[in-house]
Amino acid sequence: ARARKVNTVVVGRDGRLSGPELSRALMEGICASGVDVADIGMVPTPLGYFAAHHLKTGSAVMVTGSHNPPDYNGFKIMLGGDTLHSTAITALRTRLVEGRLAGGNGNIRQVDVRQDYLERIVSDVKLSRKMKIVVDCGNGVAGAVAPELFRRMGCELVELYCDVDGNFPNHHPDPSKPDNLKDVIRALQETDAELGLAFDGDGDRLGVVTRDGEIIYPDRQLMLFAADVLARNPGAQILYDVKCSRNLARSIRHQGGKPLMWMTGHALIKAKLKETGAPLAGEMSGHIFFADRF
């Protein structure tokens, strides 16, 4: 961090049981290198990125196992506005193993940015009418934010597993697997809700189900998002990963955009998004990246 002239790093964590211990050790290590920490607590990964911009640090580490099994955990790292991946990660590991670390005495401060995050979204995204929706957080950390967000947007909710529990006792929080959407589909059949939304363990991937129980896979979601984004950004590039349907490229061209296929991996997609200045990108895994108004 200091090599990139970073003075403060935001640190957040998802709801996994090992999160408090790992995040505490991480923050102590960051402080021992002379860098300050803004501790934002247990939050979804998108809120961590928001905090890095909102607090003007440009740097954040999310302690998260994403969609992996409950006993897994790890770090998603952004320093100086860049998400670390590939050789940058291996170089960091080498530096840690060799003990080539800076010394210092940073400070930790607790910061609550949830209300700022919610207000940013609610002030920007306006629904044309009220909706009743099913929200399945899979006992992941999205449950700490999503219900309040959708209610503030004017939605009536049918909540499934929105209490955060790192054991994931009901089903695994991975909406890319149809088996994990069965409860959403059942709730849609048993209620008059018109849309189902499901999140992964750290709240940065989305599953969508229609009232008829049809799963709208992420490449089809991108077709809809591209239509909206291209209406405001005619001729813009839209990025997608290699796992998406070839129909996505056709749809983007039909809407006047320029499709660009790129490598799978949220860090790789984000790096290409920054390089190209594209307003929208997405992956078949369910990661969607908006850069037009955010």
Model-predicted regions and their roles:
Residues 73-191:
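Gly/Ser/Thr-enriched, mixed-charge loops and adjacent short helices
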Residues 47, 90-119, 123, 211-284, ...:
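Proline/glycine-rich low-complexity loops and linkers
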Residues 12-13, 79, 135-137, 210, ...:
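Short glycine-centered, acidic/aromatic-flanked micro-motifs in structured strand/loop junctions
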Residues 4, 126-130, 233:
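Short, flexible coil/linker segments at domain boundaries that flank nucleotide/cofactor-interacting
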Residues 57-66, 70, 188-210, 215, ...:
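Glycine-rich phosphate-binding loop
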Residues 2, 6-72, 119-120, 148-209:
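N-terminal small/polar loop signature for handling phosphorylated ligands or for N-terminal nucleophile
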